[in-house]
Amino acid sequence: MAKLAEEMNPEGSRYQLLLSCPSGLSPSQVSVDFSKSHDRIPRQDPGLEDSISQVWEQRSQGNSSLFNGQKFRYGGYCLDDDDGSTNEVPHVCLRLGLTDYRTFVGTNLSSLWEKFLVTSEDDSVRCRHTSSPLGNGAVIETSDKKIIVLRRSNNVGEFPGHYVFPGGHPEPTAVGIDYHQLENNVQTGEVLNKKVTQEMFDSIICEVVEETGIPASSLSSPLFIGISRRELNVRPAMFFYLKCSHHSDDIQRLYSSAEDGFESTQLHTVSLDELKMMTSRMPGCHHGGFALYELMLQRLKNTKETSLIAT
């Protein structure tokens, strides 16, 4: 089955790792620069820009579940490592703007998506004309070391029927953002940036609870492990690692009461080897999430080996 899916859509599972944080970063090691300067820049092509509303109208006709809403736009990142050390735990600043689902459908998900790209080695420049809303995903380990994977329903907008990690999007409205405020007040801007940073971590907990039924009290604090981008549609997503105190046998019972269970048809708790076999049936951004998890595991292994040698 996995091989067949890959043959049907080989592009769909390809990915690029934009940022890897294998040590796992806590909220104190992540910050956000939320600014209009990180918003999408319109393409200097009136016909292409007009296609955004046309694609949206076509997609929304007869689809009552499709609605527009604000999203955070991924505009790149910077690493704050001013001391020049080789510390593996840097401080990451995410550059975020504002976009909406309508523009996402009309740029990234459009059949014309490649025409919105610019030839550049700089990812933020290459994708400056795309909506690029920042998605999120959670690699969750149960108490018996199984990983939770969902199979998407056929009613979702992207990759129906594929395997994914629980996740969704951090939401601007969760921190009271409907539009860009005047940024004359530096103090107000700093407060807002802190709220947006916290939303990056709070939102993944909310998504996990809503999609799996696992209570928040059973989850560890999320650790940010990086950002991947699906090559098809240049779709970015940030990934987190969480531990769950429940045994895998308990997860199915919890899933039956999940608030957003309609977004998926099945929940699987799988071993690492089983998960590897499923990656060709994952969207590229989630395949990249698995790669980020592998890098985290490799670092843990290397750290343990180094510790043993030292003793």
Curated annotation (Swiss-Prot):
The entry's keywords? Hydrolase, Magnesium, Manganese, Metal-binding
Q: Which GO terms describe its biological process?
A: cellular response to ammonium ion
The entry's cellular-component GO terms read: cytosol
Query: GO terms for molecular function, please?
Result: GDP-mannose hydrolase activity; metal ion binding
The protein's enzyme class: hydrolase
Task: Note whether Hydrolase occurs among the keywords.
Answer: yes
Domain of life according to the entry: Eukaryota
Where does the record place the Nudix hydrolase domain? 131-298
Residues holding Mg(2+)? E207, E211
Gene3D superfamilies in the cross-refs: Nucleoside Triphosphate Pyrophosphohydrolase
What residue intervals hold the motif Nudix box?
A: 192-213
Is Chaperone one of the keywords UniProt gives this record? no
Matches recorded under PROSITE patterns: NUDIX
Q: What cofactors does this protein use?
A: Mg(2+); Mn(2+)
UniProt note on tissues of expression? Expressed in roots, stems and leaves.
Listed EC numbers: 3.6.1.-
| Disulphide bond pairs | none
Would you identify the family this protein belongs to, as annotated?
A: Belongs to the Nudix hydrolase family.
The record describes the protein's role as: Probably mediates the hydrolysis of some nucleoside diphosphate derivatives.
Name of protein: Nudix hydrolase 9
Q: Which organism is it from?
A: Arabidopsis thaliana
